[in-house]
Amino acid sequence: MTYTLVLLRHGESEWNALNLFTGWVDVHLTDKGVAEGKRAGELLAEHGILPDIVYTSLLRRAISTANIALDAADRHWIPVVRDWRLNERHYGELQGKNKAQIRDKYGEEQFMLWRRSYDTPPPPIEAGNEYSQEGDARYAGIDIPKTECLLDVVNRMVPYWESTISKDLLAGKTVLIAAHGNSLRALVKHLDQISDEEIAGLNIPTGIPLRYELDENLRPVRPREYLDPEAAAAGAAAVASQGGK
């Protein structure tokens, strides 16, 4: 028996469109992002993938994408679980800043270290910064990070996968995870056993479902597959080029 998992990065957000580091800042989808969410749901339906449960973050761009996709797939009625551990990586002091300007100010090498290295976090966000999450009611009782690298995201995402999400898969449920570029990269790294060095080259496009078929050990039985490979390739290339505009 195989188990079906679908990963979905949220549709384009307002800050994606502005080329800003977003992280834990709670921004809306653009009209394009809404359309991407709808198309994602249509792709699920076209491929006969019927999610039984959805996991998403506490950020509206992922929650909205999940809701739009489920509505388009006529699965709006299934359970939705929201958890902060699926949040995007916290970009620290970079949150709200333009990627191209950061690259120009600090140079390509430092920019790429902060953006794509496995274990180098950006500078921590300062108390009182308008893009800090201190005092946000949704994070009550949580030790809110001040910055994160991808390793930090792996360390919160993978235990949640193992303790919670995996149980639904092994119970025979088709699981949809609607989350963010880095929380999904963390999970893909775990599932496909990608090295710390190679993960830097993995870019996940917005709004295109990525399907896994997993065995009883929750290891892939075949390579991961985007439901729209051509659009995914173009989208991944666009993500890779961020900072260059």
From Swiss-Prot:
The organism's place on the tree of life at top rank: Bacteria
Reactions performed catalytically: (2R)-2-phosphoglycerate = (2R)-3-phosphoglycerate
Family matches, as PROSITE patterns: PG_MUTASE (PS00175)
Pathway where this protein functions: Carbohydrate degradation; glycolysis; pyruvate from D-glyceraldehyde 3-phosphate: step 3/5
Record has Chaperone as a keyword: no
Residues engaged in binding substrate: 9-16, 22-23, 61, 88-91, 99, 115-116, 181-182
Family membership: Belongs to the phosphoglycerate mutase family. BPG-dependent PGAM subfamily.
Alphabetized NCBIfam families for the sequence: pgm_1, PRK14115.1, PRK14120.1
Annotated protein name in UniProt: 2,3-bisphosphoglycerate-dependent phosphoglycerate mutase
